[in-house]
């Protein structure tokens, strides 16, 4: 969006959400608002229903693990001790505006947020994806189950502390004639052999 359109949207947001605790930043032609998890549903409904905003479409939703970050936005808000966040990308078809919402989850051990399916139905599979990959639980989701990994998958593969090789591996067992799961058997190995050259190797004789 152009700066004038972003400024207009920012003004509308400040007026409509004046009674809410909202941190706003403008970077790369887009607005981002940082809100508290307890205010998520109220603000989401306002963003959708208020005629000056009319964010009727949820374009994307994703989880983020900030455990290895020092800041949480391009503008440099301090991350504090909250590890997980959920980011929402909204579109207003009526006004042709876009908005990003970032919400940090309070509990690092059992991350949980309210589902926004009843506000934006397109959140359904996005919330399932964040649950599957990050382990973020969405309250009142009608069908919260894994969507990308298998049902017996252990852990959440997009968390920063998830091992690169995983925990289990899958292979076909010719004796049982079916696919089986077993603990990973990957071992550290040296792909390029270590070669010790003899002294004076490559030096021209005189």
Swiss-Prot record:
It is found in: Cell inner membrane. Its main location: membrane. It catalyses: a quinone + NADH + 5 H(+)(in) = a quinol + NAD(+) + 4 H(+)(out). NDH-1 is composed of 14 different subunits. Subunits NuoB, C, D, E, F, and G constitute the peripheral sector of the complex. Its EC number is 7.1.1.-. Belongs to the complex I 30 kDa subunit family. One of its GO terms (cellular component) is plasma membrane. The lineage of its organism: Bacteria, Pseudomonadati, Pseudomonadota, Betaproteobacteria, Nitrosomonadales. Disulfide bonds: none annotated. This is NADH-quinone oxidoreductase subunit C. It comes from Nitrosomonas eutropha (strain DSM 101675 / C91 / Nm57). It holds the Pfam family Complex1_30kDa. NDH-1 shuttles electrons from NADH, via FMN and iron-sulfur (Fe-S) centers, to quinones in the respiratory chain. The immediate electron acceptor for the enzyme in this species is believed to be ubiquinone. Couples the redox reaction to proton translocation (for every two electrons transferred, four hydrogen ions are translocated across the cytoplasmic membrane), and thus conserves the redox energy in a proton gradient. InterPro entries: NADH_DH_suC, NADH_quin_OxRdtase_su_C/D-like, NADH_UbQ_OxRdtase_30kDa_su, NADH_UbQ_OxRdtase_CS. It is an enzyme of class 7 (translocase).
């Amino acid at each position: 969006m152009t700066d004038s359109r972003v400024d207009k949207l920012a003004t509308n947001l400040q007026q409509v959400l004046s009674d809410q605790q909202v941190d706003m930043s403008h970077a790369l032609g887009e607005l981002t608002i940082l809100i508290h998890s307890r205010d998520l549903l109220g603000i989401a409904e306002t963003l959708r229903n208020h005629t000056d905003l009319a964010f009727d479409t949820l374009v994307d939703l994703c989880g983020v693990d900030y455990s290895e970050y020092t800041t949480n936005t391009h503008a440099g808000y301090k991350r504090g001790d909250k590890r997980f966040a959920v980011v929402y990308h909204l579109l207003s078809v009526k006004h042709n505006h876009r908005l990003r919402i970032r919400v940090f989850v309070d509990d690092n051990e059992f991350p949980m947020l309210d589902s926004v399916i009843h506000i934006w139905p397109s959140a359904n599979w996005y919330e399932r994806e964040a649950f599957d990959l990050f382990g973020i639980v969405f309250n009142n989701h009608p069908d919260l189950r894994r969507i990308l990994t298998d049902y017996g998958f252990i852990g959440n593969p997009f968390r920063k502390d998830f091992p690169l090789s995983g925990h289990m591996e899958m292979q076909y067992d010719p004796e049982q004639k079916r696919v089986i799961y077993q603990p990973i058997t990957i071992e550290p190995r040296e792909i390029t052999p270590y070669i010790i050259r003899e002294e004076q190797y490559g030096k021209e004789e005189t």
